[in-house]
Amino acid sequence: MTVLKIISWNVNGLRAVHRKGFLKWFMEEKPDILCLQEIKAAPEQLPRKLRHVEGYRSFFTPAERKGYSGVAMYTKVPPSSLREGFGVERFDTEGRIQIADFDDFLLYNIYFPNGKMSEERLKYKLEFYDAFLEDVNRERDSGRNVIICGDFNTAHREIDLARPKENSNVSGFLPVERAWIDKFIENGYVDTFRMFNSDPGQYTWWSYRTRARERNVGWRLDYFFVNEEFKGKVKRSWILSDVMGSDHCPIGLEIEL
């Protein structure tokens, strides 16, 4: 039996978090796979030591727009293939999608859109959700096991944010967004963190504006999901809430293969 440790983190700028000790943390944590969201850089804008980390293969999927969005993956064992989109141009150009084939499972590293900016962006977010669900269902229905990680930009239930009442009309906790997560789960996917932890006060994002983190006024926006058939392989799912450097903290998953 092999235990695989996967970490997911919205770093809110890879160059910024690098200046705050990212590589030291990475080398101490030693995940088998590290998925990053919101890297805000193309590979050529990154220092060499971020592009080439000893013992890892790295894959960068930047947005076409400079300094925006983008996802990355560092992995000890290279995937047999890596797909960077759903085949829908308006979603695939924003650097939000990596789908890596590790033979035993497909790993989706996704930075889901934020719907706060405008009605138009909320519509884009919901359409992105549906394109993702269609893609992951197709893979799962063909017999693949899947792990989905990343920043979903939505808190699912009242337990998943500190102030649900005040935020019921705010994107990130709108009924329509929460209903999509319900639908996702009904399609046969499991929120792995809630397999192990049913406590309130468990968050992964805190606003920079109001010293929210020291008061733990946060939201749980980052998730590891697996398909129902694969959940027996999940040994642990946790939040690394003491890791600083971004407005999000990392989350972890251990699976036994």
Swiss-Prot record:
Which InterPro entries does its entry note? AP_endonuc_1, AP_endonuclease_F1_BS, Endo/exonu/phosph_ase_sf, Endo/exonuclease/phosphatase
Q: Which CDD domains match?
A: Mth212-like_AP-endo
Q: Which GO terms describe its molecular function?
A: class I DNA-(apurinic or apyrimidinic site) endonuclease activity; DNA binding; double-stranded DNA 3'-5' DNA exonuclease activity; endonuclease activity; metal ion binding; phosphoric diester hydrolase activity
What are the protein's UniProt keywords?
A: DNA damage, DNA repair, DNA-binding, Hydrolase, Lyase, Magnesium, Metal-binding
**Residues reported in the UniProt entry to bind Mg(2+) 1:** N12, E38
Ranges that cross the membrane: none
- The UniProt entry annotates the active site at D151
For binding Mg(2+) 2, which residues are annotated in this chain's numbering? D151, N153, H248
Write down the Pfam families for this protein, in alphabetical order.
Answer: Exo_endo_phos
Reported cofactor(s): Mg(2+)
Q: What is its EC number?
A: 4.2.99.18, 3.1.11.2
Q: How is the cofactor bound?
A: Can also use Mn(2+), Co(2+) and Ni(2+).
Q: Summarize the record's disruption phenotype note.
A: Depletion leads to the loss of DNA-U repair.
Biological-process GO terms, alphabetical: base-excision repair
Q: What catalytic reaction does the record list?
A: 2'-deoxyribonucleotide-(2'-deoxyribose 5'-phosphate)-2'-deoxyribonucleotide-DNA = a 3'-end 2'-deoxyribonucleotide-(2,3-dehydro-2,3-deoxyribose 5'-phosphate)-DNA + a 5'-end 5'-phospho-2'-deoxyribonucleoside-DNA + H(+); Exonucleolytic cleavage in the 3'- to 5'-direction to yield nucleoside 5'-phosphates
Enumerate the Gene3D superfamilies for this protein. Answer: Endonuclease/exonuclease/phosphatase
Q: Which family does it belong to?
A: Belongs to the DNA repair enzymes AP/exoA family.
Q: What is the documented function of this protein?
A: Involved in DNA uracil repair. Recognizes DNA uracil residues within double-stranded DNA and initiates DNA-U repair by endonucleotic incision on the 5'-side of the 2'-d-uridine residue, irrespective of the nature of the opposing nucleotide. In addition, acts as an apurinic/apyrimidinic (AP) endonuclease hydrolyzing the DNA phosphodiester backbone immediately at the 5'-side of AP sites, and as a 3'-5' exonuclease. Strongly binds to double-stranded DNA.
Query: Miscellaneous notes for this chain?
Result: The insertion of the side chain of Arg-209 into the DNA helical base stack seems to be crucial for the uridine recognition.
Q: Which PANTHER family match?
A: AP ENDONUCLEASE, DNA-(APURINIC OR APYRIMIDINIC SITE) ENDONUCLEASE
Q: Which NCBIfam families match?
A: exoDNase_III, xth
Any idea what this protein is called? DNA uridine endonuclease
